[in-house]
Design a protein with these regions (language model features):
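Short helix-loop hinge/linker segments at domain boundaries
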Residues: 35-38, 45, 56-79
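Central regulatory/effector-binding core of bacterial HTH transcription factors
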Residues: 73-136
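A short LG(V/I)-centered, amphipathic sequence patch enriched
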Residues: 23-40
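C-terminal regulatory
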Residues: 118-120, 130-251, 278-281
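Short amphipathic alpha-helical coupling segments at ligand-binding clamshell hinges
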Residues: 88, 224, 260-274, 279-280
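Residues within helix-turn-helix
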Residues: 1-6, 13, 20
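Alpha-helical residues within the helix-turn-helix
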Residues: 6, 24, 98
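Residues within the DNA-recognition helix of helix-turn-helix
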Residues: 11, 17-21, 92
Length: 281
């Protein structure tokens, strides 16, 4: 019994207790025990034949899963923020599938946080650190920040702000995350944080819609730099108050457990990191 416990890396007392529970459940003795010997009873011999069959099936099942786990294939369910997903990542995911045609993607585009424990979602791409410390977060763009921006058309009608308090005279496009309106905008200057309470005539829980309002000249948006990188590059949006650093908005790939880090997930993480690095300002 002690040798079996050592092989299973458990205490001998735990092994004895487990055997006793099994015998109680079966209503029979499987072993004849003494202080010096241990041998199977007739019932134990019969039970062992079936137990070996079950253990073999378990080993074969584990081997099958492990073989699959070594290949970049199968179903992969993703949750991605609205603006980043629609306007940045969708073509990248097409590329990823072209590289790995055995992958089947299921994509949920939403700014609402998916419940990775209850919903059938393998991984989520999220801004910020997960509130649940039990989750695994792999950095994709750890240094990403928010930028304050507006369209050239907006700045033709309104003077560019020179200091944070000027934002109180601008139409600021606010975003809802969960049940909270993101209306206190945080910035950094000379290693000190400063914040300003903003107001405006539009609020949405869809980041893509906030960006579209900014493009249409409806107001100023405080967006992740990744979300608006293409618009900034092409001059459709312009950064203002650039002498302030925007609030950190690190992007992570999040999953409920480290066992979810299949080769497909790790490969996707590496692929996205390489693409996101190209968007750095």
């Amino acid at each position: 019994m002690s040798a079996a416990a050592r092989e299973l890396d458990i205490a001998p007392a735990a092994a004895s207790a487990a055997l006793k529970r099994l015998e109680t459940a079966l209503g029979t003795r499987l072993f004849v025990r003494s202080t010096r010997s241990l041998r199977l009873t007739a019932d134990g011999e019969r039970y062992l034949i079936h137990a070996r069959t079950v253990l073999l099936a378990i080993d074969e099942g584990a081997a099958s899963v492990m073989r699959d786990a070594q290949t970049i294939a199968g179903d992969l369910s993703l949750s991605i923020p609205s603006d980043l997903g629609r306007n940045v990542m969708l073509p990248w995911l097409d590329e990823f599938q072209a590289l790995h045609p055995a992958i089947r993607l299921r994509i949920r585009i939403s700014d609402r946080l998916a419940d990775l424990y209850r919903q059938t979602i393998d991984v989520a791409i999220r801004y910020g650190e997960p509130e649940d410390s039990g989750m695994v977060a792999l950095p994709l763009a750890p240094d990403n920040r928010r930028v304050l921006c507006g369209s050239p058309a907006y700045f033709k009608r309104h003077a560019m702000p020179k200091k944070l308090s000027d934002l109180q005279t601008h139409n600021c496009l606010r975003f809802v995350l969960g049940d909270a309106v993101h209306e206190r905008w945080l910035f950094w200057r000379n290693k000190k944080s400063e914040s300003v309470m903003v107001n405006g005539d539009r609020i949405s829980d869809d980041g893509d819609l906030v960006r579209r309002w900014a493009l249409a000249g409806r107001g100023l948006a405080y967006k992740s730099q990744l979300d608006v990188s293409n618009d900034l590059k092409k001059g459709r949006l312009v950064v203002t108050l650039a002498h302030y650093k925007g609030e950190l908005a690190p992007l992570n790939l999040v999953c409920a457990h480290r066992l979810m880090l299949s080769p497909a997930v790790v490969s996707l993480r590496d692929f996205l990191r390489a693409r996101l690095d190209q968007l750095k300002p």
